[in-house]
Amino acid sequence: MRYMATYDLMETMRTTNQWLGATAQAMGSYPATGLMPNPFFQMAAAWGEVTERTFSRMVVKPDWNITTVVGEDGRDHVVEVETVVKRPFGDLIHFKVSGMKPRKRRVLLVAPMSGHYATLLRSTVMSLLPDAEVYITDWHNARDIPVSKGKFDVEDYTAYLVEFMRALGHSTHVIAVCQPAPLALAATAYLAEHDPQAQPRSLTLIGGPIDPDAAATDVTDFGRR
């Protein structure tokens, strides 16, 4: 009952802030306010838009919205998303560029599974597409996975990464962003010991908590209490 009351309180705060943001956006973007020289209304509309978006629930997975990429020939080439490895808790997908020869450089982006979809790395994918074959871990929302599929913990997460790296082979460059950095390191170390032929060519860790004590934060301080 205590946890339910806490959840209800947080949900009430979320919906209230979402409503405040929507109200501010509606009032600030009203056509009549645009006639006034005071920038307050534009600022209120911008604040309202950001606030409403921040406190809204992500009900539907955002689309990648990567339709074309400019090739070396200066032309637009169609980008298709194809599934390479399909698993209950996440897939390995590939951004296939039509009309272009496969690039020699192969990059695996390990996206975070921390309340965001892999589309959070959309801009990173777009920046890599002209120069590399881009793959990414497309994690599923846990609420959409039936209990019959079993558990998914740190060991399972690491096993998924090992499987994805094996599927792509030794010539892959792995880039782990934020939360999966330690697990990508563990998966790479596992392959280095047990299957060197599948070990990635390089491993880049961006913003990951490899050594939390290296730069103490409020979170690490709280963990020591």
Where are these regions (language model features)?
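N-terminal cap/leader regions of alpha/beta-hydrolase-fold enzymes
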Residues: M1-R225
